[in-house]
């Protein structure tokens, strides 16, 4: 079956099981060709940065599907940040799609499309747009991050091109991107004191 949020050939895959208390995320980092704009997007099943997930884990209710989020950070002149957490009722995953509330990720066999329909924080500005990641090549490398192999990382597309088109805020650019995934079978803080 799928591992590390990927198929055996390295392509993103969104239907991988996630252990209670665990996590799985897909991470995109991009910089515009002009160097003036950037973005980071993280799609979480079991948001490791969520105080609500941590609290649920402490109460013995660590269902990662009740703590899904699309974290979007836009850098440059039109900065925005989103991190709305959504429950199992507001998400859907299959091999090619991960729907988180009104937003979604979709792998079409060639590129990853991220439809962003979120609201910013702390100011509730709309954040609406589309990001397309076109991998230069796919990697099937899968690396354990701790001595027991409970936490793993894999670069999906270390070198990729990106197209960014947002209506809110008004942004259009192209640039270089990086795509990877991380997964864990237990809470991240059990193996790590800090995360860079």
Where do the protein language model's features map onto the residues?
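Targeting-peptide/extracellular-domain and disordered-appendage signature
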Residues: 1-196
